[in-house]
Amino acid sequence: MKPVKIITKAFSSFLWVGYVPVAPGTVGSLAGAVVWFVMPYKTIRVRLPVVLLFFLIGLVVAALEEKETNKKDPRNVVIDEVVGMWILFMLIGCMYFKDSIPKTATAFVLFRVFDVAKIPPMRVIEKIHGGLGVMLDDVVAAIYSAIVVNLVFFFL
């Protein structure tokens, strides 16, 4: 396998996490959450550029994987779930796992529900050609989840 393909597969599958046989999207989301909480530098000023960089990388590698597999949003591509989780955690203010276990767990479950259910306009967004459609539907799932989590924890 050529080095470019290896790099593409490594990024798109978040270091091969996307190749687990059962529920790769859920496992990818969980891997993203774990990495988020072990990342050093718990400030938005540091994290935001990392998230933006991974979003841009995701645009490219998701498009390349779609082209290679001839499938829309292949199961092994989980960088979109990872970036979606990271955006969600930024939007709900979760930087430290130990301080926000209920909020983190709620966010994770809601993100997976919204990502799987594809509540409008996610179906339309998912149909956008290439990596943009792959990445954006998870961004929308993150936004929907953040709205619900923030409302729930505001009123609790």
Tell me the role of every PLM-derived stretch.
Residues 38-40, 56, 61, 92-93, ...:
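Hydrophobic membrane-targeting signal helices
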